[in-house]
Amino acid sequence: MALLAAATLNPTTHLSLRSRAGRNSENLWLRSTASSQKSKGRFCNLTIRAGTPSKPAEPIGPVFTKLKPWQIPKRDWFDKDFLFGASTSAYQIEGAWNEDGKGPSTWDHFCHTYPERISDMTNGDVAANSYHLYEEDVKALKDMGMKVYRFSISWSRILPDGTGKVNQAGIDYYNKLINSLIDNDIVPYVTIWHWDTPQALEDKYGGFLNRQIVDDYKQFAEVCFKNFGDRVKNWFTFNEPHTYCCFSYGEGIHAPGRCSPGMDCAVPEGDSLREPYTAGHHILLAHAEAVQLFKARYNMHGDSKIGMAFDVMGYEPYQDSFLDDQARERSIDYNMGWFLEPVVRGDYPFSMRSLIGDRLPMFTKEEQEKLASSCDIMGLNYYTSRFSKHVDMSPDFTPTLNTDDAYASSETTGSDGNDIGPITGTYWIYMYPKGLTDLLLIMKEKYGNPPVFITENGIADVEGDESMPDPLDDWKRLDYLQRHISAVKDAIDQGADVRGHFTWGLIDNFEWSLGYSSRFGLVYIDKNDGNKRKLKKSAKWFSKFNSVPKPLLKTTNNNATMTAASVSV
């Protein structure tokens, strides 16, 4: 996976007004373009468009509510070149963990060695069996009218030992997948690494804790460029490095499962205040080396793009105070800026340098030059938002995890006692579409408005949800996606350069430490019927949504006006 604005709208006239309203109590049919807290209340900038329906929009409220027909996003709200697609990752769907010469990954080792660390004691040995059923995945994409499929390459399927001899069977598998996508008019977007480092490198030198990983990753990336670059024109070097570093080396709940002694994790032999930054530093150096190689040898004609996919979370101040406003800024730095700031400007955010001290490694001048402006495209993986609450920097508070370093706690409930949005089937995801709009506007206003793709966005169905007894009737997912697609359009209307939206995920998959208890797919995987693929309600909606003939869609107009009212309030 699977867990910040003034608009110029053309050509319609519009009226802006300021209205005092609660976060979940807005009963107008309009779009929230910005919000800020003032004394004794919350103000929202609201834009009313001429010619749109006069009926009120349904507020999100504390629980899920289905949208009215006129609130549902339409494909012609977006430029014809805007890409809708879906995402997956290798370990979560492929299975065939030891077939055809594949070597074990850190996730193979983690699940086999510490099965109790997975909520349902499962693993990715078979997963959705996409290694054998990839054509069914391609068919599902085509049935939904999706134009893009973002998937990842299993490092240990290509290089079983992490380096050295290439496994031709692995190359053949990805060639077949890529060719099948292209034959069905679906564009492949490839993530080179999505958390599944070869276990051989973990055993040899500690994986991303050792600088040797930089050279070995570069070799792996070159194998990918050399074998697939004639057809793959869009690459992401790394997926969600922030979550990886925090969960794998801070809390230790993901492979390789390291944390400080005395903490509860699989391998309590690490340093939760230092190792996340060491691993993250090596990820950034590996990214820079791979990008330099790519641009020097494999993109001479300039027709390909490369970047990184960042996990991001939106933040609002816990209450109307200077300290919580500052806490919000630090939270954004530590969540989004940790990896984004270096690939834009060449170094970590100032707040991180100030608070972390010598635990945060330094870049050389040469490394900074390689990192700065190293992304042609950027991916944002957005699921949810939080309130950010200041934590006093006092002797009474001592950080124990790297996530404590921001001196800001992440809260699901604000000072008024209200949740930031309705909770979804997955405990950590609260629906807050405005958070996505806000982050896209940060990309525009703070980071130079680079081309951005929403590379992951979605929620999970969970076992035992009585409101959704039929696994194919995923109306909550549909509502969530519709509201977030509208939130993307909000940002586009305000000038953000957003190029696509990829739902997480294409199919139900192995959801890391949650196993198969959380189902994020547009497509249901029937484990009792040979992993048979079945389209859910959300998938069938995309089939209709994407059915608009391309000649009827607009061309290159990021400020195109919506044809229906926004619902991302």
UniProtKB/Swiss-Prot annotation:
A GO CC annotation given for this chain: chloroplast
Keywords of this entry: Chloroplast, Disulfide bond, Glycosidase, Hydrolase, Plastid, Transit peptide
Subcellular location: Plastid, Chloroplast
Enzyme Commission identifier(s): 3.2.1.182, 3.2.1.21
Catalytic activity: Hydrolysis of terminal, non-reducing beta-D-glucosyl residues with release of beta-D-glucose; DIMBOA beta-D-glucoside + H2O = DIMBOA + D-glucose; DIBOA beta-D-glucoside + H2O = DIBOA + D-glucose
Positions of the catalytic residues: 240, 456
Record: residues binding a beta-D-glucoside: 92, 194, 239-240, 383, 456, 504, 511-512, 520
Example GO biological process: carbohydrate metabolic process
Gene3D superfamilies reported for this sequence: Glycosidases (3.20.20.80)
InterPro entries: Glyco_hydro_1 (IPR001360), Glyco_hydro_1_AS (IPR018120), Glyco_hydro_1_N_CS (IPR033132), Glycoside_hydrolase_SF (IPR017853)
Effect of pH on activity: Optimum pH is 5.5.
GO molecular function, one term: DIMBOA glucoside beta-D-glucosidase activity
Tissue expr: Expressed in young seedlings early after germination.
Disulphide-bonded residues: 259-265
Function: Acts in defense of young plant parts against pests via the production of hydroxamic acids from hydroxamic acid glucosides. Enzymatic activity is highly correlated with plant growth. The preferred substrate is DIMBOA-beta-D-glucoside.
More about this protein: Wheat is a hexaploid with three different genomes that contains at least four genes coding for GLU1: GLU1A (AC Q1XIR9), GLU1B (AC Q1XH05), GLU1C (AC Q1XH04) and GLU1D (AC D5MTF8). The monomers can aggregate in diverse combinations, reflecting the several isozymes found in the native enzyme described in PubMed:10750901. The hexameric structure is required for activity toward DIMBOA-beta-D-glucoside.
Subunit structure: Homo- and heterohexamers.
Name listed for the protein in its UniProt record: 4-hydroxy-7-methoxy-3-oxo-3,4-dihydro-2H-1,4-benzoxazin-2-yl glucoside beta-D-glucosidase 1b, chloroplastic
Taxonomy of the source species: Eukaryota, Viridiplantae, Streptophyta, Embryophyta, Tracheophyta
Encoding gene per record: GLU1B
